[in-house]
């Protein structure tokens, strides 16, 4: 990023994304060494119900539906055409919780750096959130960069920054092109009954 400065959340571009209700669709490239995996992700929530889909054409099609009020979740395997149900009121924590560091639940908790980031030949106004986590005992800083076109997010880039034998190593681990962002839930994604009717219920082995 260039022309970087720290800004309060209220002056950030990200303030437009800090909503309990939203729909986000993104084409993603996950980078792991010489391997690149292309996928599409969809997230939509109304603050109570949420829809999350990961689609890797030909390899994976997973959908998770969650209803906070019912304390239930449905995991759909689109490749198999089946789904399972979990009643997580029986668990001390939500079994669907994971460490997905591509999702920020509350931007206001983080220091926000603002500047410009170049994608292709275009420089976009951008906000960056950075936090440190530990991988195999080694601290790694994760930098999440959001590029904006007006008030709408256009790109999301995730970089990992670590120290290797005294040298700083920066790796891009994810590149995402945001194809849709709206500050409301898509009614089609919230219609769980219609979605589940397209799949067969199977018993969860767990």
Say what each PLM segment does:
Residues 123, 173, 180-184:
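Short, intrinsically disordered, low-complexity terminal segments
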Residues 3-11, 15, 21, 25, ...:
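Extended beta-strand-rich segments in extracellular/periplasmic secretory proteins, especially
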């Amino acid at each position: 990023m260039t022309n970087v400065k720290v800004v309060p959340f209220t002056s950030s571009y990200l303030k437009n994304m800090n909503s309990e209700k939203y729909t986000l669709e993104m084409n993603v490239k996950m980078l792991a060494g010489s391997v690149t995996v292309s996928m599409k992700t969809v997230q939509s929530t109304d603050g109570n119900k949420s829809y999350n889909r990961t689609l890797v054409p030909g390899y994976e099609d997973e959908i998770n539906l969650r209803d906070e009020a019912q304390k239930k979740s449905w995991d759909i395997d689109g490749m198999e055409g089946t789904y399972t149900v979990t009643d997580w009121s029986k668990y001390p924590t939500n079994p669907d919780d994971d460490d997905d560091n591509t999702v920020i639940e509350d931007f206001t908790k983080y220091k926000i750096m603002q500047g410009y980031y170049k994608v292709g030949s275009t420089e976009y106004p951008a906000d960056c959130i950075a936090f440190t986590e530990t991988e195999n005992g080694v601290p790694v800083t994760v930098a999440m960069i959001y590029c904006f076109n007006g008030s709408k997010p256009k790109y999301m880039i995730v970089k990992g920054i670590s120290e290797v034998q005294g040298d700083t190593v920066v790796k891009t681990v994810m590149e995402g092109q945001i194809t849709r962002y709206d500050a409301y839930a898509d009614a089609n994604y919230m219609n769980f009954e219609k979605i589940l009717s397209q799949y067969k219920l199977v018993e969860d082995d767990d």
